[in-house]
Amino acid sequence: MRSSFRRLIRSRDGVSAIEFAIILPVLLTILIGIFQFGTAMSNYLVLTNAAAKGALTLALSRGTTTPYTSTTAAINAAAPNLNTANITTTVTVNGSTCSSDSACLTNLLAGKTATVRTTYPCSLVVMGTNYAPSGCTLSAQTAQMVQ
């Protein structure tokens, strides 16, 4: 009986499986965290590109009747992977914020600055833990000279 007990104590069978079971949750947490961060970074790049497309569209909209509508449409078209209902857009022309076509039309003067700021909510939840409990918001801003 003593010899079988000694053999059991000295045996290394199953040690690798136990070590793997101990380290697996840590590895999964790191892997899922990398995935979440990658998704947030991808969303940020798409949002930045959408803001740039919107600012360019706005800067080239002098002389058209729908500069604000064209700008928001360009932003939504440039962000196909994002939920466009959650994208918040702020359009500023010549220092004045505009939220309609008529408001933008009066301020679109050649040589002035057209600025588009976009924001989008993000989620940083990894394995049930929210790493941004107060909320995470991605934002991008681009300015162009009105042509």
Each model region followed by its residue ranges:
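Low-complexity, S/T/G/P-rich flexible repeat/linker segments used as non-globular hinges
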Residues: T115-Q147
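Low-complexity, intrinsically disordered short peptide segments enriched in small/polar/basic residues
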Residues: R2, R6, R12, N43, ...
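Residue-level preference for short coil/turn positions at secondary-structure junctions
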Residues: R10, A110-K112, L138
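Short amphipathic secondary-structure patches
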Residues: N49, G54-T119
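Transmembrane beta-barrel outer-membrane domains
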Residues: A21, L109-G111, P133
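Alpha-helical assembly-interface signal, strongest on the long, hydrophobic N-terminal helix that forms
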Residues: M1-A78
